[in-house]
Amino acid sequence: MTVKLTIDCMGGDHGPSVTVPAAVKFVRAHPDAHLMLVGIESAIRAQLKKLKALDDPALTIVPATEVVAMDDPVEVALRKKKDSSMRVALNHVKEGAAQACISAGNTGALMAVSRYVLKTLPGIERPAIAFALPNPTGYTMMLDLGANVDCEPQHLLQFAEMGHALVAALEGKERPTIGLLNIGEEVIKGNETIKRAGELLRASTLNFRGNVEGNDIYKGTVDVIVCDGFVGNVALKTSEGLAQMLSDIIREEFGRSLMSKLMALLALPVLMRFKKRVDHRQYNGAALLGLKSLVIKSHGSADAYAFEWAIKRGYDAVKNGVLERLARAMADNSVSLGDGEHDAGGAGQASPAAGHHAEPSAAQSSKA
């Protein structure tokens, strides 16, 4: 099966100088992939010429005359720029010409245009950005990571339902554990939105284990962590900054003297493994969950290496049938939520997440 993806080549901080090289490298490594490069034709052609890929049959240029800037208001992207690379890329997915869209564009604009063009699954009011964060035994699903800055309690419940469905579909778990990100485990902690969301989660049939704190994110305390997009995005980017700082400190300390440089040579295999594990670029590419089609959001500041990972998320999601499995799990879960008995879930308790051993698929991964 040929996997057909649209690439919003003009999105992100760097546009075609990042997206096109990433696309070229990806198709050279994945012969069953066909990428539609959407954007300003002359800009895309210039990059393809540099890479000697103008005649690559796995790459098709799809012209678009407008660009959604990173600081464009949502209404501009939605109502005025109807021939933007973002809109055209999403239209191709809607029309069935492609199976997923990958964009590093403006998060708010991407969510709004995606909702308008592709529509949401039944019972979902707002899509959410879901990302698989590594933990000692695998990955913890976390959402929302930037699509919704302000959320109502029922939105957080819907995010939990989507996270439950995704983990159930991908990991085969009947009852994934759910945690609500808060400033403390106690039910009295948090603002009114969080308290009400906790009540809704405890009244649902989801396997809700109560509140979790920021230090639980990388422990694997629960399978799914739910939060609003403001909190999630800050937590994610704080993690990225910390990982970068640790790498810089280690590099600086090993470079201080001749002796430390010799020690670095001896420790090189360990250092390389450490660098690979904390390199956030390999986790780039987060699914916009809740839509009727696949959309992968790349970090806006991604370089070519990171954007190639975002393409891989979309490719893997299509290959693994993630959208179909998620839709089935959501439908099954809606039945259980309607017919099931009350399950308070034990607020404030935690149990280890288990079974996360595979590399995160496209629907599981990163950045807003």
From Swiss-Prot:
Catalyzed reactions per annotation: a fatty acyl-[ACP] + phosphate = an acyl phosphate + holo-[ACP]
Entries under InterPro entries matching the protein: FA_synthesis, Phospholipid_synth_PlsX-like
A GO cellular component annotation in the UniProt record: cytoplasm
Enzyme class (EC, first level): transferase
Pathway given in the UniProt record: Lipid metabolism; phospholipid metabolism
Presence of the UniProt keyword Iron in the record: no
GO BP annotations listed: fatty acid biosynthetic process; phospholipid biosynthetic process
Stated role: Catalyzes the reversible formation of acyl-phosphate (acyl-PO(4)) from acyl-[acyl-carrier-protein] (acyl-ACP). This enzyme utilizes acyl-ACP as fatty acyl donor, but not acyl-CoA.
Subunit note: Homodimer. Probably interacts with PlsY.
Protein name: Phosphate acyltransferase
Source organism (scientific name): Burkholderia cenocepacia (strain HI2424)
